[in-house]
C-alpha cells in the first residue's frame, strides 16, 4: 500500500519490462498506473540481461496477474493515451510474444544454428532498434532454451549460438 496524493494505491510488482517494475492501482477510482508494463499501442521492451532467470516468463506471469485485477476502469500508461481494456490489452501483448516465439522457431528452420544477431536481423527487418532489439531477441531465445525448446552453445569465436 502506498499513500499518494491523499489516496491509497495498491502496489503490484510486475517484473518483465524491468526486474523492478511496479504498477499502482486505486480500486476506489478504478485508476491503474500501468507504467511501461502495459502500453496501449506498442509492446514494452523485454530486456534479456537481468537478474531474473527468464524475463519473458516473468513478464507473462505479471501480465496474467494484472489481467486478474478487478475494478480497473482506466489504465494510465507511461507512453501513449489512457485506455480502458487492461485485461484485453495484457492478453494481446502476450499473444504478440507468443507469435514472436513462433516466428523465431520459423526463422530457426531457415537459419539453422545462429547467433542472437542473426535472429534479430530477421525479427526486426522493418526497423532497426539496435541494442533493444538484440536484447529482446536474446530474451526470447533464452526463454525457449529455459523451456527446453532450444539449446545454446559457444561457437569458435565465442559467440552464443542457438539450435532450435
What are these regions (language model features)?
Residues 3, 23-25, 163:
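Short, well-ordered beta-strand micro-motif
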Residues 5, 27, 155-157:
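Structural motif
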Residues 6, 70, 108-112:
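Short coil/turn residues that cap or connect secondary-structure elements
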Residues 8-103:
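Metallo-beta-lactamase
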Residues 103-164:
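C-terminal regulatory/interaction regions
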Amino acid at each position: 500500500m502506498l499513500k499518494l496524493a491523499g489516496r491509497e494505491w495498491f502496489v503490484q510488482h510486475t517484473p518483465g519490462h524491468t526486474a523492478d517494475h511496479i504498477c499502482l492501482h486505486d480500486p476506489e477510482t478504478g485508476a491503474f498506473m500501468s507504467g511501461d508494463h502495459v502500453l496501449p499501442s506498442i509492446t514494452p521492451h523485454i530486456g534479456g540481461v537481468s537478474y531474473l532467470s527468464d524475463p519473458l516468463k516473468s513478464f507473462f506471469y505479471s501480465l496474467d496477474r494484472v489481467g486478474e485485477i478487478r475494478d480497473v476502469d482506466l489504465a494510465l500508461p507511461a507512453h501513449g493515451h489512457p485506455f480502458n481494456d487492461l485485461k484485453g490489452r495484457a492478453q494481446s501483448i502476450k499473444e504478440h510474444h507468443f507469435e514472436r516465439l513462433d516466428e523465431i522457431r520459423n526463422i530457426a528452420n531457415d537459419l539453422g544454428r545462429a547467433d542472437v544477431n542473426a535472429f534479430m536481423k530477421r525479427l526486426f527487418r522493418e526497423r532497426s532498434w539496435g541494442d533493444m532489439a538484440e536484447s529482446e531477441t536474446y530474451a526470447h531465445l533464452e526463454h525457449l532454451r529455459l523451456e527446453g525448446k532450444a539449446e545454446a552453445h559457444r561457437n569458435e569465436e565465442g559467440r552464443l549460438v542457438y539450435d532450435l
